[in-house]
Swiss-Prot record:
<comment type="function">
    <text>Involved in ubiquitin-mediated protein degradation. Regulatory factor in the ubiquitin/proteasome pathway that controls the turnover of proteasome substrates. Targets proteasomes to the nucleus and facilitates the degradation of nuclear proteins.</text>
</comment>
<dbReference type="InterPro" id="IPR038422">
    <property type="entry name" value="Cut8/Sts1_sf"/>
</dbReference>
<keyword id="KW-0813">Transport</keyword>
<dbReference type="InterPro" id="IPR013868">
    <property type="entry name" value="Cut8/Sts1_fam"/>
</dbReference>
<keyword id="KW-0963">Cytoplasm</keyword>
<dbReference type="GO" id="GO:0070628">
    <property type="term" value="F:proteasome binding"/>
</dbReference>
<dbReference type="GO" id="GO:0031144">
    <property type="term" value="P:proteasome localization"/>
</dbReference>
<comment type="similarity">
    <text>Belongs to the cut8/STS1 family.</text>
</comment>
<dbReference type="GO" id="GO:0015031">
    <property type="term" value="P:protein transport"/>
</dbReference>
<dbReference type="GO" id="GO:0031965">
    <property type="term" value="C:nuclear membrane"/>
</dbReference>
<keyword id="KW-0653">Protein transport</keyword>
<dbReference type="Pfam" id="PF08559">
    <property type="entry name" value="Cut8"/>
</dbReference>
<dbReference type="GO" id="GO:0071630">
    <property type="term" value="P:nuclear protein quality control by the ubiquitin-proteasome system"/>
</dbReference>
<feature type="region of interest" description="Disordered">
    <location>
        <begin position="34"/>
        <end position="74"/>
    </location>
</feature>
<protein>
    <recommendedName>
        <fullName>Tethering factor for nuclear proteasome STS1</fullName>
    </recommendedName>
</protein>
<dbReference type="GO" id="GO:0005737">
    <property type="term" value="C:cytoplasm"/>
</dbReference>
<keyword id="KW-0539">Nucleus</keyword>
Amino acid sequence: MMGFEWGFKPSSKITQSTVSSQGTGNVMIPTAGVKQKRRYANEEQEEEELPRNKNVMKYGGVSKRRPQPGSLIRGQPLPLLRGMELMNKNQYRQLLVDLMTKHPEIQQSVHTRVIGLDFSIQKCLDMLKQKSEAVYQSIPYNRSYESNKLDDYAFVRMKPQILEFLNCLVDFILDNIPPRLENLHASLKFLDICTELVIKLPRFELASNNYYYDKCIEQLSHVWCTLIEHVARDRIILLADNSSVWKSHMTRLQVYNEHSNGLLERPLQLFKSLDMGSPSAASSSTLSLQESIIYHHDTMTANENNNNSGSAATDSPFN
């Protein structure tokens, strides 16, 4: 009894079937064994061609079409608004400077938008304190600023930070006095703090290295006199406000004058001429103050003429 046969037929049977086919007039009579041989031969051929197919996956045996380059997702830069959200302050500023340099026609438009913004006094003070700290951090590590005897080497290292601070201070002061700011109390308070920041800056042993400090204090003296002139002309402030407010400013100004070797003497005298006691006293003090202001303006003009005739530093922020 023959069982289930797997694979090829034995060679003897294949030979017998071949002989029998030759004896029947060269007519090939297919047998079951030949059919199975073809089927198994085709299966072996498929098994040999299977590893050659590069598109067959290693795991799972599922073929995959090679992706074309056009169907791949390509990276792209951020949109303009999304990129601007990630930019910091320095990058914004550099971008604006580069744009205004390449396109000068947009400078006026940018300036108009900037001056239309309302910056708080506290924000200005925070910026000034940061720039003041930069001055202290630029002091050489082997020198102490408390002695106020910094040498020439320290001046060379600190000069860029000093000029940046003083330039920023002057710009902020001019933006916070009349007519830009009508609140005289806020203007005086801001000027008071700015004067204190300048007075406390470390000074140098050589007097010529303190030129920028002294020049700045002279300009602050002119601003003090200008604000006192506005106060003298405003009768409501003279009569309604508490005299202790003005005395507080005068006391602090006196301390600043002592530390600046008398450079703030003129506004101090103008403050002392104010009398808040009565309307008649206020009126008389206003007249005497106006006479002092006329003398102040004449003195300021003479000093400016002397400064223009002499040689001054080209990088001074106050020339």
